[in-house]
Amino acid sequence: MSTFHIETSIGSTDPAVVIAALHNHELMIKTLCPALVSYAFESGDKATSAVYTVTDKKPIGQTTFKLTLTNTPGGVDSLVNAKPPVGILTIAATWRVADGKLTEDVVIDGNFMMKKVAKGNVEKTHPEQHTKLLEAARA
């Protein structure tokens, strides 16, 4: 397993506003998947915990995966269950707002190749996703 910790200052933004943005599943999906092709609600309750099928564009084709978003008092938990051609990939993250920061703790599990690809993607895109999410929360 690979783990990562990412944090971004929320500045003067009210923490409740940032938490509300995290609880907005449509906003989270659009923020987490910048190359989003489509998504569909599968099951659960969008106000608490829901499963979505997400299709994302990749450099070569598209990938479809299950995304579970679970609202918590301080943020949201996300769980990606993907089945790419070369194995299974699970990305679990906790997004929390506390002490003037948006923090994300990520755990990636899969075979060596999938972990390496996912790790590079998380390191490259997630700080940018924090910024976009905070911009949307402030809008």
Give the label of every model feature segment.
Residues 38-39, 43-91, 95-97:
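Hydrophobic-cavity lipid-handling domains and compact docking modules
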Residues 25-29, 40, 71-75, 99, ...:
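Short, low-complexity, polar/charged sequence segments that are solvent-exposed and flexible
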